């Protein structure tokens, strides 16, 4: 089985699926039950500050929120929030350790830390996720739908949303204009 956890999936330019065209997906979990990830470059119109206000967390004083947008993390469980974040001293109710430095949290207790010193140093918030059944993603990779590259935190948290696809390709040393529109197999 391929090891895909903590990797980026980079949609090939010829990807025909409207949802995933030109997308970068961070793989949070990959095991013998399937694969789950978050699309990193499809921001919604909702800011994290607005999300906190809707959840009544902004009623607390002394909080500052950045202007980051909530991501459309994928077409599955679109009403559910997923927070990918750097390691914190605090533990949260529903967290999954992705790497030694990154966790995925789905419980609202993490949102209560936003705007405080207890918040993770870096985080992104997504509504929905992408998921694949066992061997489905490996089949899509074999069909040249995706490129795979080890993830890095700069692209995860610091690169503007609209530049993430190009930046992820650069991790492989590929300029987008060098892509062939067909792939061949020997």
Curated annotation (Swiss-Prot):
A Pfam family matched in the record: DUF179
- The protein here is known as UPF0301 protein PM1869
* GO CC annotation: cytosol
Gene3D superfamilies hit by this protein: VC0467-like
Where does this protein come from, organism-wise? Answer: Pasteurella multocida (strain Pm70)
Q: What family does the Swiss-Prot or TrEMBL record give for this protein?
A: Belongs to the UPF0301 (AlgH) family.
Question: By its UniProt entry, which HAMAP family does this protein fall under?
Answer: UPF0301
InterPro entries xref list:
AlgH-like
- Superkingdom, natural source: Bacteria
